[in-house]
Amino acid sequence: ERFGSGTGPFRWAPELIAGSLPLDEWETIEQKIWSSPGTCNVMGTASTMTALAEVMGMSLTGASSVPAMDSRGHQLAAAAGRRIVQLVWDDVKPSDIIGDASIRNAAKAGVALGGSTNAASHLIAIARRAGSGFTLEAFDDSGRQVPVLANVQPSGEYIMHEFADAGGLPAMLTRLASQLELEAPTVTGATLGENISHAKVGDPDVIRSMDNPVATEALAVLKGNLAPNG
């Protein structure tokens, strides 16, 4: 069994505490948790928010999916450095990129990724700073309308480097294109649609189609006496 984060082996912790799981077996389980440096190798908060930053147009295309030890990371870092200097010279500000369309796109992408539910609070905070009217109800609508397409743990079977190898975020966005506002601007100087126009899905089991999703509904906002506002 493969793990992409520390939450995977937690179910064996009671056995370790009770003494029914030998220490050497626990150490074997621990060694399977991390495959490289970097963030946890599942669609947790870090992987989710870097992806949403890319969808909102605030990072270079494909940057969010590159594994920590991949040489493409160095290339993208250099390209990002060059690009941000040009953006400063051109007086392009975050407010020129992040708007209602980009935030709605990010919400839908987060749902399709099977991403962290922390994305809801982060996106709402970003929206408020950007002057957008995006709300928790809007996030709930996305959760009910958009299926999970990324077959990545914890919602699916695979781990992040396999998602990257299958085409990563740009490829998944091509599957989701009918739900997106593709004219949204990005820091590349091109639109979101133009950025993903050449992306291809390398493994249709890792990045599913709208007709064959991992799950038909991803999330719903719950309201009740403990959380009347959701």
Language model features: what each stretch is:
Residues 1-230:
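Catalytic or ion-coupling anion/metal-binding cores of large enzyme and transporter domains
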